[in-house]
Amino acid sequence: MQITIAIQDTTGDDQDFLSLQVFPDMTLETLRNSIQAETSHHPSTQHLYHNGNLITDNSKTLTQLNVTDGDMLALHVRETQRATAVPESQQGRPAAPPQQDPEFLRLQFLANPALRAEVERTAPDLAAAINDPQRWAQLFRERYDREQRERAERHRIIQQLNEDPFNPEAQARIEEIIRQERVTENLQTAMEHNPEVFGTVHMLYLDVEVNGAKVKALVDSGAQATIMSPDIAEACGIMRLVDKRYGGIAKGVGTAKIIGRVHTAPVKIGSLFLPCSFTVMEGKNVDMLLGLDMLKRYQACIDLAKNALVIQGEEIPFLGEADIPKATEEALQDEPTIEGPGGTTIGQRTGAVSGPGTAQHRQGQAGPSTAAQPGPSAPAPAPASASAPAPRAPQARSFPREHIEQLVALGADEQKAIRALEATDGNVEYAASLIFEGF
């Protein structure tokens, strides 16, 4: 028959599965020896569990222990006190040279453009100090010490939770810790190998004329209808043509009030004059939106390779970043952010990454915890920063208690958990990721 062994090591970092072909009359001692042959774990360190019960009688057969075909056994590898004494003495030796010489590495990065580019992608804060030996050494040691503390803290938490391995709450916390580590690894992998996904994608705008008035129109093939704001409809002189019988409420991502509909009005796109109908709607941050109704009617093609809208053979180029409405940029500046690797910040809605140089500016707007730290040290010369922490006090108390306790269970103190929740607008998953990154 075949059984599966779920192996958990002493650190709790690695879990493996082992499939074994066994016989019903095989003793537990023979099974331990088979596991040792496959994994090199000594039988004295093997703690086997079946259906949540520790099995210790090595003389009993698998049949006597009620182990049947297809069963899974849990194996927890726990070193004895005498066996762990040797690694403790050996841990001092690797800690003696904990890292390479920072100055040697700095010179290597300066001499190798490829390595330097890699540092700029993965650790922008180090790359900014590469020409300052003292600053480089300081940041290098701080980074190494932080990683060591985080690793030791994770091991300590997992070891504490493994003291009661069949406690559902403990296992749920271990699962959350492992999941957050995978999320962080996934983020770092994306920033290293696919950094373009973190750039800001600007919307597609065109210069058009409606009834002779110039308007910047957003091209949105995901919108069902062509939309115009009441202010622009008034400026274009077509507000008097609104048929209010078509009023109502638009529901989608949120709701908006529909004032009515303009059944037809001339729109100039490029050199083409095209009749178009408009839905006049409040509550949108865009002056005019060319929807799918108009794009399909005139068989328009959004050609991203040419960065143009093609209508009836004419190519109308989309506006550049500097020409799009400023309201779009202001919305991006007000976007809440979370901390990313190497001192970067990541927008929660767009995923856009900002370097360390712009992190402090955005922290003053989005309110991460680091913006509140300089306030007490210099309240007098910086009234703007001193006023920022003022609304934080009531906000810190608004987080659910269970969210704070989840972060405390990951090794953070209560104040650190609250600051992490403030920095992520109450998102527990992002807050846990910040704590693991040394927030």
Swiss-Prot record:
It is found in: Cytoplasm. It comes from the Eukaryota. Keywords: Aspartyl protease, Cytoplasm, Hydrolase, Protease, Protein transport, Transport. It holds the Pfam family UBA. Transmembrane segments: none annotated. Belongs to the DDI1 family. The keyword Ribonucleoprotein does not apply. Residues 1-82 form the Ubiquitin-like domain. Its EC number is 3.4.23.-. It comes from Neurospora crassa (strain ATCC 24698 / 74-OR23-1A / CBS 708.71 / DSM 1257 / FGSC 987). InterPro entries: Aspartic_peptidase_AS, DDI1_N, Peptidase_aspartic_DDI1-type, Peptidase_aspartic_dom_sf, UBA, UBA-like_sf, Ubiquitin-like_dom, Ubiquitin-like_domsf. One of its GO terms (cellular component) is cytoplasm. Probable aspartic protease. May be involved in the regulation of exocytosis. Acts as a linker between the 19S proteasome and polyubiquitinated proteins via UBA domain interactions with ubiquitin for their subsequent degradation. Required for S-phase checkpoint control. Residues 82-101, 333-398 are annotated as: Disordered. The active site is at residue 220. Binds ubiquitin and polyubiquitinated proteins. The gene is ddi-1. One of its GO terms (molecular function) is aspartic-type endopeptidase activity. This is DNA damage-inducible protein 1.
